[in-house]
């Protein structure tokens, strides 16, 4: 990774707590800040809640309004990452968290920030930055879902491709100004630069998919400019499904004495209940094989990944002509259209979605239980984000990758090595639906 531009990153302490989580045990490394403050004779609440673990959401002692919303969502027991993170994050501890897709990382920062929020008219208290517009839209919806019994809390989403004047109008009116801002870096930087938004009261600063946001130099510089517009005394939380050793030091420069949690370090791909297969075939055989799979397999919703916008459009036309009603989403369509199609798919208006990698990160649609790599991607890391659309939140799911050339074979080999997983060839006789469908 290039180190260009790192010299102006904010320098904070490199001391951190690190928790390595797997299915059997939790190991805590390093000195907690509790111990450090005892030595220094100081009292600092950040990092002082190590070892608090809860088995039910009620044990977190959240606001009654949040507890009611959680019950309405049907949640009772926190996931592994929620269990280890929420008890400290609700008390203001900085967090660096890597956990595989589908373990509820979004709920960690949504619940934690809502728990701490004391809304003041006209003041932005929470900033959430993510790399994709669809993801920003989805995070906003999670805030709406969990704040349903907090009528005074307002949330807004800002991203490029829409008139900035509308954003400015919303922000300058105290009756409409949000307390929680979810945004992509470019648009939020523009609002800060033009003094359309005041971030001097921010108490919580969150970056979702932090590796993607910070590994691109331009996006990282946008984040730095936004970060400098916020108070130094605030909570910073960062989350991602993949967090390489190279990007972690970059993340840490934004953090103070963070709690670090890595669930399945190096993102070893053990997505709960997800069956993974590949199919070797010629390029010209892909359409016929895809139609056969859609006929033979049982699924609630399926997402099919392709490598380009033109292929997404052509494949969608072919599927619709073949009596497989499908919707397509890609980065070259207008933002309003992308959001509308995402919502239509999420609302189950269509069961088949053909997409480029615009849907490959963070997008959460619970009914998806089949992911097909029509075109295998070029890099191993993105595999986790693609197939992670299926089998989320511990449910079963199925991922199938088409392998049509030597380059695909090399990528498949890298995926298996990178994630320490064995991907089997799809059996000619098919597979038992009970292996990838919930009862």
UniProtKB/Swiss-Prot annotation:
SUPFAM superfamilies: P-loop containing nucleoside triphosphate hydrolases. InterPro entries: DEAD/DEAH_box_helicase_dom (IPR011545), Helicase_ATP-bd (IPR014001), Helicase_C-like (IPR001650), P-loop_NTPase (IPR027417), RNA_helicase_DEAD_Q_motif (IPR014014). PROSITE patterns: HELICASE_ATP_BIND_1, HELICASE_CTER, Q_MOTIF. Keywords: ATP-binding, Helicase, Hydrolase, mRNA processing, mRNA splicing, mRNA transport, Nucleotide-binding, Nucleus, RNA-binding, Spliceosome, Transport. One of its GO terms (cellular component) is fungal biofilm matrix. Pfam families: DEAD, Helicase_C. ATP binds at residues 99-106. The Q motif is unique to and characteristic of the DEAD box family of RNA helicases and controls ATP binding and hydrolysis. Residues 273-434 form the Helicase C-terminal domain. The keyword Nucleotide-binding applies. GO terms for biological process: intracellular iron ion homeostasis; mRNA 3'-end processing; mRNA export from nucleus; mRNA splicing, via spliceosome; positive regulation of cell adhesion; RNA metabolic process; subtelomeric heterochromatin formation; transcription elongation by RNA polymerase II. ATP-binding RNA helicase involved in transcription elongation and required for the export of mRNA out of the nucleus. SUB2 also plays a role in pre-mRNA splicing and spliceosome assembly. May be involved in rDNA and telomeric silencing, and maintenance of genome integrity. Residues 86-261 form the Helicase ATP-binding domain. Residues 1-19 have a biased composition (Acidic residues). The gene is SUB2. A motif (DECD box) lies at residues 208-211. Signal peptide: none annotated. This is ATP-dependent RNA helicase SUB2. Its main location: nucleus. The lineage of its organism: Eukaryota, Fungi, Dikarya, Ascomycota, Saccharomycotina. Its EC number is 3.6.4.13. It is found in: Nucleus. It catalyses: ATP + H2O = ADP + phosphate + H(+).
